[in-house]
């Protein structure tokens, strides 16, 4: 108790300097750390006393992705305390993928908390309506009664919380989750759309350091609330029309992905968008194989996304094939032009 009191005194004195710098996020962290001191009675895993625990079967309580192929790789989906990242270029459907993942969890009876930092909460909710019912986004108002019936039958719960871009930090999300917990709403899955748009608790000279810190905090949040967190990240321009987006295409901070448990990329060229297709590349998987490529069906008008069985093609084969197809297409156009 004495140590806790002294720590709180130090935190208050430190907060005075931080207040002059308007470092409100750091003040919150310093005070919270001081309050938590002494409240944790877990001294760690005792190697001898806790011997039997090493042989107990661990329960991940994974939440399904709704995709048989991905669930098979991830041993049922994303587990408790794990961080999953969806990587895609702008306009490829990152938010749509996150809505799909949230919908599958809600259908499975889970409570999903979906944070949106870019789109309005009603837009996100409408996408859930479409994904859940199969009704086109443009036709939702015409099928209001049908949608209401479908929503009423869903076992799970969904809470969509909107924050202006770069206004919320991981601490902001933590405070909101704590308020929900006090209202007897415990998150079974958290979705952050998307991590790159969160505000870092501290400003760094380099953006990649800020992003790395944000993703580390998100991983910590998943562990703290003992549930999976899905978020997304944007690729650089090199991934905009790439056949397959690999780890090298991740924008700004390659290191931010090291903390994630499961990473997959979504690539959709112009040709893919015209045919409602694309590719998923499993870039990292802590509980199974990775480096695998899957074709996908993606109809953004109905938020319908399906991962199809793998074809066995490698990244190199796909890129080579694409280059040859483009060359043949250009030759054909040149012939028509000459004639």
Residues covered by each model-derived region:
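Structural motif
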Residues: 85, 160, 188-191, 264
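Cytosolic-facing regulatory segments adjacent to core modules
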Residues: 104-186, 200, 293-295
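Flexible beta-alpha connector loops of hexameric P-loop NTPases
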Residues: 138-140, 162-167, 201-212, 241-248
């Amino acid at each position: 108790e004495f140590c806790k009191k002294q720590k709180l005194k130090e935190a208050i004195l430190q907060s005075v300097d931080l207040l002059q710098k308007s470092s409100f996020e750091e003040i919150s962290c310093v005070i919270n750390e001081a309050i938590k001191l002494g409240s944790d009675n877990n001294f760690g895993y005792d190697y001898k006393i806790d011997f039997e625990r090493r042989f107990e079967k661990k329960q991940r309580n994974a939440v399904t992705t709704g995709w048989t192929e991905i669930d098979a790789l991830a041993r049922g989906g994303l587990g408790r305390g794990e961080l999953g990242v969806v990587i895609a270029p702008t306009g490829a459907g990152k938010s749509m993928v996150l809505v799909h993942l949230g919908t599958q969890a809600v259908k499975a009876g889970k409570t999903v908390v979906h944070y949106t930092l870019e789109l309005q909460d009603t837009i996100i909710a409408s996408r859930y309506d479409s994904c859940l019912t199969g009704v086109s986004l443009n036709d939702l108002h015409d099928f209001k009664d049908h949608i209401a019936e479908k929503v009423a039958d869903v076992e799970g719960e969904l809470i969509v919380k909107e924050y202006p871009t770069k206004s919320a930090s991981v601490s902001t999300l933590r405070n909101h989750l704590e308020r929900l917990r006090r209202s007897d709403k415990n998150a079974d899955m958290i979705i952050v759309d998307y991590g790159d748009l969160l505000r870092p608790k501290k400003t760094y000279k380099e953006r990649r350091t800020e992003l790395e810190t944000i993703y580390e905090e998100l991983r910590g949040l998943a562990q703290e609330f003992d549930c999976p967190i899905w978020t997304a990240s944007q690729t650089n321009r090199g991934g905009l029309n790439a056949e397959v987006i690999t780890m090298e295409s991740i924008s700004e901070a390659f290191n931010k992905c090291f903390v994630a448990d499961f990473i997959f990329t979504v690539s959709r060229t112009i040709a893919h968008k015209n045919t409602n297709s694309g590719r998923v590349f499993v870039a990292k998987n802590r509980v199974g194989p990775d480096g695998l490529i899957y074709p996908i069906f993606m109809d953004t008008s109905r938020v319908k996304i399906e991962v199809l069985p793998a074809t066995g093609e490698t990244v190199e084969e796909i890129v080579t094939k694409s280059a040859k197809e483009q060359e043949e297409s250009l030759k054909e156009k040149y012939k028509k032009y000459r004639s």
